[in-house]
Amino acid sequence: RDVDFGHRVDWYDILLNKSNLGQSHYLAVSGGGENLTFRASANYKKKDGLDIASSRKEYGVRMGFTAKTLEGLLEIQGNLSTRVINEEYVDYGVFQQAVKLNPTHPLMDEKDPSKYSTLYGFDTYNPVGWLKDKEDGGDRQFSLADFKVKLNILPTLNTELSLARQSQEYFKRIYVNSNHKESIDNMRSGRGTLQSFRSEE
């Protein structure tokens, strides 16, 4: 039988986000005249995870135009879009820890209630502190631009020049503060890593 440490903690329940609502906003405008038209749109999405750590925010902007000159002899079209995604990840191993962890362990440090308790023992840790004392996320950006120039030589004859470019960037970030069990076990004041990846076409 396990030791009774005098507390009553529902570890699994604390890991669940009870208000994991999402929201989405969208705005679009367009206009122009006979020789010029334009359109632009922007959107924002936010969704919290079912747990207390994960979330996702997304911002997007699109713009485009079409212009005609020289009485329709020359047409120019352009489009530009970019999307930024901010994500916070979760270590799902904390749920396994929550199921098997002694519920009489304290959630907060008994000597310093502003900190999460540090638990010792084989494969034993505070699953709430494991998430709260660590930042594990990623930032992505997708960009796409294309332009087309069309020359209408004759009513049934034209020539076009098209240019396009797309890029992706990803920044993976991890920050473990000094109160995290990883830092305490390894006698470190914390840990931070930042990795970046980029591709273009």
Could you say what each language-model-derived stretch is?
Residues H25, E34-F38, G72-G78, P155-L161:
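Outer-envelope beta-barrel architecture signal
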Residues R1-R8, L50-S54, G60-L144, E160-S162, ...:
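Surface-exposed loop/interface segments of Gram-negative outer-membrane beta-barrel transport/assembly proteins
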Residues R1-I52, V90-G93, W130-D133, K150-N152:
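Residues embedded in well-ordered regular secondary structure
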